[in-house]
Every structure is written in structure tokens, then in C-alpha cells.
């Protein structure tokens, strides 16, 4: 994906919006569908992704997990692609070698195909069809509910996932980041099909979606195909339901414990951070890398090199709304939770008080440069990364964000550590292994 | 017509090593995949933890450089590097910017040739390994996998797993000397190195020759072929673990087959038709039709180097539907073998695999992995282009011959989780 060719063309029915670093943006005139194209004419493979601007942040009590369950039902067939006419997505795309799947997260839902390029037209036609003509049926909900419930159960088998759910649920009491994308078990089991259909009709429209194509394809042909297939749909009549709930200010540290039979002990420490587009996020990303990226990071050396923990990670989430910076440590046998919690907080305080070295700053920037280069290695990595920026609210961050990371100074890192890593804004979780009976 | 080899070139390097280089259009991305001979199958069973402890500590200090110097220099350049251990080989995987490739290759070679495993690092690695073992004791998937391997294989076979308690004993008694003795046998004979991405073949070759030429000429040797001595039996093993929301279920059978056997690819297609991808028989029935699982998969496993492997069917089930689900799984496996191995199903699967092969080659990392894997399987560079033809050439008769290797009425069974009270 090195040489991206910005071959801007004019295709009736579309409006060219802009070009940025080889990514062409268009709009479909009739319904407002956003289109992002990045061409590599010599590539034998193309990737196609539809990103709907709806995720679990658009759910509420009673239908948590609805976005994800609906994502599953979207594979049950649509008007022109279904079991009855033997044209399921598996039959017409997976059996041609396409990587076919979908993912749901807090702020978005995506559907994608990465395939030999001659099948791109099929993917466009199918995705356009299920955008407005998906079969959302009770008989499919019944069989798919148990599939999703088993996905939930798999997650519950994992101590880290169980603790993570508790930390988010405690850190957010009002905002829907409170619940995980997969939802609460009882909602998965009981959400009525009418609610899922309503969810589909509320959010699955062209003016609430972005289609992206990366790899080997002809820009003019692809745009014409998009006009033909997605142009069949009108834009939504009426406004989209706004998610207006804001998380109230946190007034003091919060603590959670998950105690289950087993041998795994974990500590998780979360702090509130601003939304992805906020100007402090680049410094927070660098801070997270200095804390726990690689074997030279502060927490790895303190916790893992010393064998107090088996592993450690720090992640600064970049979501549409304010979210969390979280450190997780898996404890070695006999290490007390309290000790790990204190050492992590000591590491935070050290940066807040004394800052970081130029060596640490440069390593973090070099690491992220390598990582960002890898995001353009192949259609799926590219689409996936672009999709997260779409979800955060501004796809151009895919191009501009790396430049902002380069500009982060040691003082910026110290400032954000002081501003955000404060106990009053923290949520601490312990997973405690209970003796097996 | 000229066959597509994706711009890859193969070189013999450092007397016994093989280098594969494939420049791609990826900018600023260099992917490295490689390995040297030396894995758990080269050691007595009781020492099978040594290769993984060694792999963890290869970058923790060498005869010339301390841990902090090695790791710091890699971090200064934004290089990621990891080592891991397998049955016959010790693997390395890295990523760097183009200008740092010579440094990455020289660091890999220095670690392989000079790691000296300081006592304090060995002690810490053992403590971490014991912690990981403790975690695995309540991992339902791992427990079922260990149980199945013990049912299928004789105790001397490489695919026979020891218990986690036995592993703990081995970790505790491992010494720095064990690690040094193992590492001293890494050599350039059998080295395989694949480098792809934003690279130039001439530059890579020069850097690889310089770096790996310092490894000893001889050491670990390829292992002789093995065959399982344990007869098939429809044995069952349940491993209860409290407080688990999901049960991991495995069905399997040892196959009298090696990777170099003509029936290997037919057996691979058979497994893929049974449980590879959403369109496979088991996913279409157990998940799509019955809604009993999030995932059910059939794969060929345990075909490391010269080892005869096995067919493994893995599914996850809800405890409350456990009995019904296991019965459905067994029934659908039988149905597949009796009615679903058809010309039409085979044609579809062949088209899927040849298409997905192309998709897999579309990243520098994917291309490096495939180049490395084909080479350690004993294939030459031409196989990169010929692989789709190999798949297309598999006939229904071949697949049915492979199916006869599966002792359908003697499939073994292992499951772990919180079981319903019956």
C-alpha cells in the first residue's frame, strides 16, 4: 500500500469532497453516503468495508447488546441474497476466498470483505442490499441468540474480560459505555425482534454510513457501482436519535472486585480521558506507550522483569466520547494485589512529578511510527484503522494523527499525567482467584 | 505462462541457511519471519519446557551485551522482536523500518549465538512461567487440549502433552546450564529466513550473510519421522472446572500421515470441508441451523516437522445445552463423512482456499509467514506459485482416501468446563 494513487475522477451521481494522502472522499448525491477510496492498481486483492455510525453507545437498558445481535442477524439474508435463492454471503463470497466478517464496538459497526479483486462488485451489491433489505426475523433471532449467548459465555470464561466489564460498568454510571458491546446476558436472551428491527430502521441508512475501498480496483468503475447499488436507497426521513447522555463528574475513587474460583489474579486501574478528537489524546497515547509498550517500558521493567507480574499492558482508548486509559497486570503467584496497585500508581506519580526522559519519548515515537506504517500493510489493516477514525468522528485523523504524535513533547506527557492520572478520577478493579471447591 | 512468485527470490546463505526475500509495495514496513532447528522434540520429555524458557530469555543478555543494551537498542529504533519455541524449531518474528533491517538481523543472530541466560533472569522467567501454568490450570480450552493429546498419543510421541503439574516440576528444576546447553546447538544449518516488504534483495542478502555467518555451522539436526504407536480408541475425558460459563469440547483422531505424504493436502481439504470457515459443514449445521455454538472448527494439528499429526474438532457449548450439543456434534460429524464429501463441496472448498491464499499473500507479514512455512516444509520457491495448482489437483477420490484414515467410530473426546448436573 505504499504508492497510493489519487486518481480523482468524475462520476455522475457523486460529488468529490477532498483528497488527503491518497484517500479520495466522495458523497453520493441522492442520499449522502460517504465514500472513501484508496487505490493500489497493481494489487490483486481489494477490501470493502461499510461502517455504520452506530455502536453499543446507542443502546439503553433492555436492549444492551442489540447492535451486536443485529450484526449477527445481518448475515441471515436479505432481499436478493439469501438461503432461499442459494445466494448467501458464504456461498457467493467466502467460497471465492474472501475474508468475510463484521465487528461491533462502542461507536460503530462494520461489515467487510477482503477478496480477490474480481469479486469486489459482488461485495458492493450485497452490502447495498442488506443496508435496507435485511431479513430481521424472529426465527433467526431465536437460533442466533444462543450463538451470541455462547460468545458471551466464552468471554465470561476469560478473567480479564470479566474484570474489564466490571471496570467499565463502574467507571460509567450514566453514559452507555457502562455496558460492554456484547451486552448483559438477560438482554441478549430477551430483547424482542421488534426492538432489533427498530434499531435497524433507526440507524441502517446511507447517510449514517461510510463505505471504504482499499487495494486493487478502478476508481471510476467502483464509484459507478456504488451509485448503481447504494443509490437505490433514500436517505433517512427524519432525524437520527441523538445519544445525549453525558457522564456526570466522578467524585472520588471507585473500586470493584470480581471473585471467582480459579488461579488468576488481576489488577486493573482505569482513569478518565477525553474523547478521541481532543488535543490531549496524542500525549496520552505517548504516555501509555512509555508506561507499558515493550520490554523497556516502565511498568514492564517494574512488574514483569521482577516477576511480580506475568504481563502488563496500558491502553488509552480513542472513542467518540470521553473514555478510559487502563492498565492491566496479571499477577504472578503470591503477589498481593495491593502491591501491584501501589507500584502502578507509583509509576504514574513519578511521571506526573518528574516527567519522562527524551530517550523514552523518542522510543515511543519510533515505536508508533513502525506501528502506523503497518496499518497500511494490506487492505484489512488499512480499512480497520480508517474505520476506527471514522467511528471517532473524523476520518482525516488517519492521516493527521501521526503528525500530531510527532509533535508531542516531554512536557506534554508530564502535563497529561498530572491532569488525568489522579486518584479521584480512577476506577480500580481486582480479579481475585478463590480456592476451587 | 510465467508463474506468479510475488517478486520473491530465494538464496542459499551461510552454508546451510535459506533466505527468501520478497519486496512488496508496503512503505516503511519490513517483516521478518525465521527459525533455526531446535525445539522440544529434540529433548527428553521431562525437559520440554527448556526451549520456551530459552526463547523468552534470548534477548535478556548475551556474552557481549547486557539485557538493557539489547532491548534499549531495539526500542530506540522502534523494532519489535519476539522469539518462540515449537516442536522442531525455535522461531523469531520481527518488524522494523527499512533502514534498521541490518541491525535487527544482527541482533537476532547475536541472541541466537550468544544468549547467556543470567541467573537472575532465569529465576524470574521460571517464576513467570509458573504463574502462567497456574492460569492455564483453569483454562478450559487448554485443559481439553492436553487431555485429548494424552488420549490420542503414546507417551513418547511429540504430540503427547505432559500434565501442567509435570510441567511445573520441570520448570522448578530447570537450570541456566540446561538453557545454555540447548542454545549452544543453534546453528546456521537449517536456518530459514524470510524478509518481505520495503526491502531490496541484494541489501537483505548482504545483511543476512553478515549476521548469521557467525552462528556455528552444525548443531541440532532434522529429526527422523515418527509414528504414533497408540491404537485408536474412543476414549473420553472430562475435566471439571468450577465457575465456568462455557464448555470447551474436542473430538479428535490421530492420523497416520505426515506433511510430506501425498494424502496430506486431501486430508487438509477434508478438514476444511468439515469445519473450516463459515460455509463448512459443521458451522452451517451446529451454529447456523441449530444455534448451539459460537464456533465449531475442524483443523489438522500437530504436523510439526517430521511428526504425524491429528484431526481436531473444537467447539464451545453452553453448559445448559451441553448434552444436546455434544450429541448434535457427533451426529453431524458422522453425517458429513457419510453424505457430504461430494464433488460439489470439494470444488467450492478448492476455490475458497485458492482465493484466500491470494488474500493471505496481500500483506508483507502474510507473505513472509507463507514463504517461511513453505521452506521449512521442504518446498522450494516455485511452490509459492504452484500451491493453488496442488489444491486444484486434489480429486474427490483423494479426499475419500484421506477420509478413510479417520477412525470415525473411534473418535476420542475431551471436554472441560463446569458441567451440568445430570
Predicted regions span which residues?
Chain A
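Generic structural signal for individual residues within well-ordered alpha-helical segments
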Residues: 121, 142, 189, 197, ...
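Histidine-acidic residue clusters that define the catalytic metal-binding segment
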Residues: 5-26, 169-209, 241-247, 284, ...
Amino acid at each position: 500500500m505504499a504508492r497510493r494513487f489519487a486518481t480523482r475522477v468524475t462520476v455522475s451521481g457523486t460529488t468529490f469532497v477532498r483528497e488527503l494522502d491518497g484517500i479520495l472522499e466522495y458523497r453520493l448525491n441522492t442520499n449522502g453516503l460517504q465514500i472513501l477510496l484508496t487505490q493500489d492498481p497493481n494489487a490483486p486483492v481489494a477490501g470493502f468495508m461499510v461502517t455504520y455510525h452506530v455502536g453499543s453507545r446507542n443502546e439503553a437498558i433492555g436492549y444492551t447488546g442489540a447492535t451486536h445481535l443485529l450484526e449477527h442477524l445481518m448475515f441471515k439474508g436479505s432481499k436478493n441474497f439469501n438461503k432461499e435463492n442459494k445466494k448467501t454471503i458464504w456461498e457467493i463470497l467466502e467460497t471465492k476466498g474472501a475474508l468475510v466478517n463484521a465487528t461491533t464496538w462502542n461507536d460503530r459497526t462494520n461489515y467487510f470483505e477482503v477478496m480477490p479483486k474480481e469479486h469486489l462488485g459482488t461485495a458492493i451489491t450485497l452490502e447495498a442490499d442488506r443496508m435496507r433489505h435485511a431479513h430481521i426475523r424472529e426465527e433467526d433471532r431465536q437460533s442466533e441468540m444462543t450463538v451470541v449467548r455462547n460468545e458471551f459465555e466464552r468471554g465470561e470464561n476469560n478473567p480479564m474480560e470479566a474484570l474489564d466489564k466490571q471496570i467499565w460498568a463502574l467507571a460509567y454510571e450514566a453514559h452507555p459505555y457502562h455496558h460492554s458491546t456484547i451486552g448483559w446476558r438477560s438482554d441478549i436472551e430477551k430483547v424482542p425482534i421488534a426492538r432489533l428491527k427498530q434499531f435497524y430502521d433507526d440507524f441502517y441508512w446511507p447517510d449514517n454510513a461510510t463505505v471504504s475501498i482499499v487495494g486493487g480496483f478502478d476508481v471510476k468503475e467502483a464509484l459507478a457501482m456504488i451509485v448503481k447499488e447504494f443509490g437505490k436507497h433514500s436517505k433517512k426521513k427524519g432525524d437520527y436519535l441523538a445519544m445525549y447522555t453525558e457522564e456526570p463528574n466522578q467524585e472520588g475513587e471507585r473500586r470493584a472486585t470480581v471473585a471467582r474460583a480459579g488461579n488468576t489474579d488481576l489488577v486493573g486501574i482505569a482513569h478518565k480521558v477525553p474523547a478521541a478528537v481532543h488535543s490531549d489524546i496524542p500525549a496520552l497515547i505517548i504516555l501509555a506507550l512509555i508506561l507499558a509498550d515493550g520490554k523497556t517500558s516502565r511498568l514492564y521493567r517494574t512488574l514483569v522483569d521482577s516477576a511480580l507480574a506475568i504481563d502488563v499492558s496500558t491502553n488509552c482508548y480513542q472513542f467518540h466520547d470521553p473514555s478510559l486509559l487502563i492498565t492491566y497486570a496479571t499477577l504472578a503467584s503470591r503477589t498481593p494485589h495491593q502491591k501491584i496497585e501501589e507500584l502502578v500508581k507509583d509509576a504514574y506519580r513519578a511521571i506526573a512529578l518528574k516527567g519522562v526522559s527524551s530517550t523514552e519519548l523518542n522510543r515511543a515515537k519510533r515505536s508508533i511510527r513502525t506501528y502506523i506504517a503497518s496499518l497500511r500493510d494490506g487492505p484489512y489493516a488499512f480499512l480497520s484503522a480508517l474505520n476506527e477514525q471514522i467511528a471517532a468522528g473524523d476520518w482525516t485523523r488517519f492521516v493527521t494523527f501521526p503528525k500530531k504524535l510527532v509533535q508531542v513533547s516531554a512536557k506534554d506527557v508530564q502535563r497529561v499525567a498530572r491532569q488525568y492520572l489522579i486518584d479521584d478520577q480512577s476506577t480500580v478493579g481486582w480479579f481475585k482467584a478463590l480456592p476451587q471447591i | 505462462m510465467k508463474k506468479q512468485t510475488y517478486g520473491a527470490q530465494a538464496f542459499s546463505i551461510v552454508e546451510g541457511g535459506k533466505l527468501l526475500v520478497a519486496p512488496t509495495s508496503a512503505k516503511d514496513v519490513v517483516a521478518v519471519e525465521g527459525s533455526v532447528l531446535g525445539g522440544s522434540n529434540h529433548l527428553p520429555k521431562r525437559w520440554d519446557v527448556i526451549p520456551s524458557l530459552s526463547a523468552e530469555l534470548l534477548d535478556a543478555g548475551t556474552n557481549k551485551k547486557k539485557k538493557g543494551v539489547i532491548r534499549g537498542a531495539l526500542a530506540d529504533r522502534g523494532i519489535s522482536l519476539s522469539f518462540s519455541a515449537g516442536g522442531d524449531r525455535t522461531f523469531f518474528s520481527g518488524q522494523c523500518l527499512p533502514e534498521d533491517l541490518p541491525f535487527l538481523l544482527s541482533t537476532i543472530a547475536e541472541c541466537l549465538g550468544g544468549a547467556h541466560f543470567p541467573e537472575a533472569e532465569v529465576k524470574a522467567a521460571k517464576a513467570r512461567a509458573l504463574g502462567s501454568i497456574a492460569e492455564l490450570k483453569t483454562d478450559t480450552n487448554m485443559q481439553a487440549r492436553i487431555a485429548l493429546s494424552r488420549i490420542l498419543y503414546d507417551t513418547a510421541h511429540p504430540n503427547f502433552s505432559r500434565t501442567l503439574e509435570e510441567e511445573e516440576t520441570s520448570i522448578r528444576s530447570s537450570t541456566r546450564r540446561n538453557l545454555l546447553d540447548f542454545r549452544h546447538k543453534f546453528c546456521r544449518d537449517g536456518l530459514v529466513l524470510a524478509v518481505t516488504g520495503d526491502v531490496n534483495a541484494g541489501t537483505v542478502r548482504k545483511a543476512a550473510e553478515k549476521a548469521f555467518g557467525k552462528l556455528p555451522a552444525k548443531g541440532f539436526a532434522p529429526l527422523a519421522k515418527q509414528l504414533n504407536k497408540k491404537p485408536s480408541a474412543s476414549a473420553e475425558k472430562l475435566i471439571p472446572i468450577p465457575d465456568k460459563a462455557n464448555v470447551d469440547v474436542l473430538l479428535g483422531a490421530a492420523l497416520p500421515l505426515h506433511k510430506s505424504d501425498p494424502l496430506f493436502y486431501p486430508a487438509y481439504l477434508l478438514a476444511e470441508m468439515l469445519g473450516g470457515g463459515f460455509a463448512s459443514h459443521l458451522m452451517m449445521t451446529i451454529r447456523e441451523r441449530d444455534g448451539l455454538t459460537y464456533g465449531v472448527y475442524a483443523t489438522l494439528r500437530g504436523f510439526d516437522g517430521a511428526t504425524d499429526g491429528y484431526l481436531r474438532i473444537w467447539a464451545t457449548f453452553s453448559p445448559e445445552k451441553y448434552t444436546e450439543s455434544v450429541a448434535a456434534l457427533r451426529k453431524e460429524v458422522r453425517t458429513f463423512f457419510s453424505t457430504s464429501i461430494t464433488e460439489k463441496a470439494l470444488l467450492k472448498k478448492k476455490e475458497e482456499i485458492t482465493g484466500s491464499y491470494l488474500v493471505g499473500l496481500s500483506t508483507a507479514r502474510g507473505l513472509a509467514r507463507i514463504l517461511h512455512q513453505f521452506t521449512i516444509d521442504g518446498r522450494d520457491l516455485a511452490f509459492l506459485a504452484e500451491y493453488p495448482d496442488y489444491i486444484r489437483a486434489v480429486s474427490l477420490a483423494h479426499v475419500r482416501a484421506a477420509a478413510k484414515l479417520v477412525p470415525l467410530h473411534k473418535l476420542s473426546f475431551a471436554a472441560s468446563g463446569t458441567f451440568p448436573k445430570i
